A protein has these predicted regions:
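Active-site-proximal helices and loops of the catalytic beta/alpha 8
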Residues: 5-117, 126-130, 134-141, 153-276, ...
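Histidine-centered active-site/metal-ligand motif
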Residues: 121-122
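Substrate-gating cap/lid region and adjacent catalytic-acid/histidine neighborhood
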Residues: 145
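Active-site neighborhood of phospho(di)ester-bond hydrolases with catalytic His/Asp-centered motifs
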Residues: 148-151
Length: 301
């Protein structure tokens, strides 16, 4: 649940909304147990994020949005500022290191998470030269991330995006790929490992990276360790939920990747980018035909 312009409502009122929403959610789940809707069996609490213009990272909750307002996260303006039509900053490997220190808790949650974005309807669409790199560094950034529609397809700022009406351009028509009718096939095996992606190379890249993040909580919340050049192990273990998750992320097309700090020998892994299945030997894996990234997770049946 996203609360717009959160600063204009007193934090205790937001907290009441959170409490009442959780109460209503639990009552609904109790009344619908065993029914057709799988959400009745979920355990997650009502989730709330807030927008406060210009707010940035605040993992210790210095602004009180978590403790006094009940928010789980706040939208992070660090990479796309407050100026209309302004330029954007893009995350990098150094951003991963910085954000892992704030949000890579390894267990549980930070006091106040961030929801990081690079494009906004209020300011500008972030369109650096390499949109694949943007997908890599945003979708694998620790903490929460938000993909504004069309980031994944390099949607253009047009249809009303003149200097006198910039916001119309940031809300331009979606540039759906030519094979959009195949979307059901793209999503068919997202819980295990998808085998079909868009023929649009940029979108396919964002799909692979985003699905890897979807399957692995360690990507956004795991404790990060740099185990080799451009190679990171992220681990998340939470006794309360029973989650025990680890991934290795390698930026580059190298065929041999060190994983020993994250996975034991003889562990079977899958590379979410190339689709290959590999087995750890001598603390390493060898990818037969690596892509632009190596995204390693436990093999899923």
């Amino acid at each position: 649940f996203r609360c717009d312009t959160a600063k204009h409502v007193a934090k205790p009122s937001w907290k009441l909304l959170k409490e009442y929403s959780n109460e209503a959610l639990n009552k609904w789940r109790e009344a619908n147990k065993g029914g057709a809707d799988p959400a009745a069996e979920w355990k997650d609490n009502f989730w709330m994020t807030g927008e406060h213009w210009g707010y940035k990272t605040d993992p210790s909750d210095g602004g009180g949005y978590a403790s006094s307002g009940g928010f789980d996260s706040m939208i992070n303006f660090s990479f796309n500022g407050q100026a209309k039509g302004g330029s954007c900053g893009t995350p990098s490997i150094n951003s991963w290191k910085e954000y892992a220190g704030m949000y890579g808790v390894g267990s549980g949650s930070p006091k106040l998470n961030a929801l990081t974005y690079v494009s906004s309807h209020d300011t500008s669409l972030c369109r650096p030269g390499n949109m694949k790199d943007l997908g890599t560094y945003l979708e694998l950034l620790p903490g929460g991330v938000q993909v504004y529609y069309g980031d994944e397809t390099a949607r253009k700022n047009d249809n009303g995006g003149a200097s006198n009406d910039i916001e119309h351009g940031t809300r331009s028509d979606m540039n759906f790929p030519s094979d959009i009718s195949s979307q059901a096939e793209w999503a068919a095996n997202v819980d295990t490992l998808s085998t079909k992606f868009s023929s649009d190379a940029t979108l396919a890249h964002w799909q692979k990276v985003g699905q890897f993040r979807f399957r692995n909580v360690a990507v956004g919340a795991g404790k990060q360790e740099e185990i080799d050049s451009n190679t990171f192990c992220r681990t998340y273990k939470d006794e309360g939920t029973g989650i025990d998750n680890a991934v290795v992320i390698h930026v580059g097309a190298d065929s041999t990747v060190n994983v020993g700090a994250c996975f034991d020998d003889n562990t079977e892994l899958q590379d979410a980018y190339s689709g290959a299945t590999v087995t750890v030997s001598g603390g390493q894996v060898t990818i037969p035909a690596p892509g632009e990234l190596v995204l390693l997770e436990l093999k899923r049946n």
